[in-house]
Amino acid sequence: MNIKLTLLVLISIINLMIIQPIQTLAFPIYAQQGYENPREATGRIVCANCHLAQKPIKIEAPKTVLPNSIFEAIVKIPYDTNNKQLLGNGIKGSINTGAVMILPEGFKLAPKNLLSEELREKTKNVYIQPYSTTKDNILLVGPLAGEKNQEIIFPILSPDPSKDKNIHFLKYPIYIGANRGRGQVYPTGDKSNNNPIVSLNTGKVTKIISLEKGGYKIEIEKDNGEIYTENIPQGLNLMVSQGSQVVANQNLTDDPNVGGFGQTEIEIVLQSPSRIKGMIVFFFTVTIAQIFFVLKKKQWEKVQAAEINF
């Protein structure tokens, strides 16, 4: 199983590198490699450690589901499709998306052979994988081309308490984390080029040198007369010019990040079929009783009217 999973991941990565060679920072696999569980004890999903900007996401799923049934959980990752992100080589490219879904124990990705034709069509070309062989209730997907995947459909199979005594007919939480665009920090802790460059010291910009391969070198004279150099990578726009006065931690460039990460949660009820049948019988009985009560009341009113007339 581990070999098959590894091969599938490698094939996915190779395909993505061929199609989108630079868009690698949205890989949820980074969380997979670094954390046994993507949700910390505080409730924070670890993807937020690399994707520092916060952006909204939404999830749509049924309020209740029956055991051993397949349902859709739709994750919505909105963003302006006119925006382009800064890629690793300093050029602008399309934004990608990715998501992690943490299901209750027993819930898992629905096998493809159980999907309806409609659901199979909706989820084609979207590779969703379990977080690990021991955590098949945690699902990962991405990176995906964002233009076509601002909505990601997860086909979920609910558990059956009659087959698993650890599962009960209860209300359960589902946790979702999703990102659009690249992160600002690598798993190693190093910053990516998807950050603004800030001045390390207070001083004056004395020289700006445009580099042949793109980017700049900025020479800044500190208050004590010492000159130091700030290196600006390709793709960032300068916010200072020669002669500008700068202070420590002032942005020398714009912020290239157009993406961000968001997380949310919903609740879903695993409903007992016998309870539903019982409720139907109860409501049917109450309805019949009310009908008989109304008929009896009308009959009594007729008797009363007849006695008055007599």
Curated annotation (Swiss-Prot):
Query: Which Gene Ontology terms describe the biological processes this protein takes part in?
Result: photosynthesis
**Which keywords describe this protein according to UniProt?**
Chloroplast, Electron transport, Heme, Iron, Membrane, Metal-binding, Photosynthesis, Plastid, Signal, Thylakoid, Transmembrane, Transmembrane helix, Transport
Signal sequence span is 1-26
Q: Where are the transmembrane segments?
A: 276-296
Q: Give the CC-aspect GO terms.
A: chloroplast thylakoid membrane
Membrane topology reported for the UniProt record: Single-pass membrane protein
- Keyword Calcium listed? The answer is no
Localization terms from the record = Plastid, Chloroplast thylakoid membrane
**Matches recorded under InterPro entries:** Cyt-f_TM, Cyt_f, Cyt_f_lg_dom, Cyt_f_lg_dom_sf, Rudment_hybrid_motif
Q: Name one Pfam family in it.
A: Apocytochr_F_N
Cofactor field:
heme
Per the entry, the cofactor note is:
Binds 1 heme group covalently.
MF-aspect GO terms: electron transfer activity; heme binding; iron ion binding
Q: What is its main location?
A: plastid
Q: Which residues bind heme?
A: F27, C47, C50, H51
Instruction: Answer whether the UniProt record assigns the keyword Chloroplast to this protein.
Output: yes
Q: How does it assemble?
A: The 4 large subunits of the cytochrome b6-f complex are cytochrome b6, subunit IV (17 kDa polypeptide, petD), cytochrome f and the Rieske protein, while the 4 small subunits are PetG, PetL, PetM and PetN. The complex functions as a dimer.
Role description:
Component of the cytochrome b6-f complex, which mediates electron transfer between photosystem II (PSII) and photosystem I (PSI), cyclic electron flow around PSI, and state transitions.
The entry sums up its family as follows: Belongs to the cytochrome f family.
Q: What is this protein called?
A: Cytochrome f
**Species for this entry:** Gracilaria tenuistipitata var. liui
